[in-house]
Amino acid sequence: MLFLNAKFIDLDLGENAVIVNEDDLKGTSYYPQDRVLIESHAGSVIGNIYSTKTMVQKGEVGMLVSELAEISISEGEEVKLRHAEKPESIPFIKKKMDGQVLNPHEIRTIIDEIVSKKLSNIELSAFVSSTYINGMNMDEIGEMTKRIAETGDMISWEKNLVVDIHSIGGVPGNKYALLSIPILAAAGITIPKTSSRAITSPAGTADVMEVLTNVELKEDEIKRIVKTTNGCLVWGGGVNLAPADDIIINVERPVSIDPQPQLLASVMAKKIATGIKYSVIDIPVGKGVKIKNEAEGAKLARKFIELGELLNIKVECVLTYGGQPLGRAIGPALEAKEAIEALQDPKNAPKSLIEKALSLAGILLELGGAAQIGEGQNLAWEILESGRALEKFNQIIIEQGGTPKKPEEIELGDYIEEIIAPIDGYVTDINNTGITNVVKEAGAPRDKKAGLLLNSKIGNKVKKGDVLYTIYSGSEERLVSAVNLARRVYPVKVEGMLIERISKF
């Protein structure tokens, strides 16, 4: 047992940790990465030991701000460190690593210990990896989904008909929600849209919306906004909705994996938590996205529908084209700018963006009874073209604490590089993965001003020297890295009519 004085450390390690001077560890039974219980007069918290020579002095224990808040202690106060019990879920994680089926108790224990931070990031990574490799059956996924939802707040609504649109993502520039949500809200449909931040893409819906307004809102604020406007566009993590999901996502993000069991549970847990009764789920299909072909997409759609039945949520899925970015803008600020331009002048907006936004909104207009079957997309267009969607979008921005902006008022990265066509020809391919990696290298989504603007898309004719796309960044160093990557991976491919000259057999 160790008695040490707490010292505040302004550091975010993504998990609970205590930083101990290596001299205090000598001759004890405590070692780096040991799990310990930190106790004070006000409570206790579990963390893993990290050793240091200089960050804290002998007799001190470095504690992260989240831990200090969790047990309500002051800097300099004495705390006690003792060995914590091994998490109950460790054998269950090993069981899943061996490809075995987990029972409800085992699944609930894993999720509970994720939320209570009894599992280290290494242990959580092992669980995520095991589901990525070995998968889960529908009973396991259903149990995991319910427990993830139960770990946080549960929002209830006065109205019975509450709907939602969700995309599983993977498509760069997937900003459709900034059009679809205000279209539906303007039609009187209740649609409280909660989104995650980017996992595998350069910008999630929450990242894009955050360029324009506050997305970290509490439950009472969301209910007030939805009562006033019929809709919202907020970050689910700001509302304590399914907090286990956000912890899992933070482990998935560095390695850009999104295991299908977690994907299903993540999406549907948020639906349970936000009181959704009807949901349309967009499954992009194509090269460079999560789902490679229509057969895979149909299989995943059936799983969403089956899971929805287990959870008493009506789910309808749509397979959409994901073979190239949606619209021309990729990255938070650029996508926000393009979305506003589309709301202001839909006739001159990218057709792919308009078509997807109208199609998804149209389905829910029909499910919600605002339009007859087959007429939803027409009604969605009327709302968009009339300016009602823009008016509703600005109302949502104001209610969430922002100020409506004109497209030209949105700030982009100061460091810019244009990539030009090397030959005359046609754009024959746009590599989603390459585009995503280039934009991430430029700094997105953390750097909201970082992004990429496409001048040409697949099938467009270009001349040598034409600008294919422009990379933006808030950092000169990040821009150089992004440009170097772009020149290695060629995310936009141009080919001439002459493919190869053959003169010998």
UniProtKB/Swiss-Prot annotation:
PROSITE patterns hit by this protein: THYMID_PHOSPHORYLASE (PS00647)
Keywords linked to the UniProt accession: Glycosyltransferase, Transferase
GO CC terms of this entry: cytosol
Xref: InterPro entries: AMP_phosphorylase, Glycosyl_Trfase_fam3, Glycosyl_Trfase_fam3_N_dom, Glycosyl_Trfase_fam3_N_dom_sf, Nuc_phospho_transferase, PYNP-like_C_sf, PYNP_C, Pyrmidine_PPase_CS
Catalytic activity: AMP + phosphate = alpha-D-ribose 1,5-bisphosphate + adenine; CMP + phosphate = cytosine + alpha-D-ribose 1,5-bisphosphate; UMP + phosphate = alpha-D-ribose 1,5-bisphosphate + uracil
Active site as annotated: D258
Protein name: AMP phosphorylase
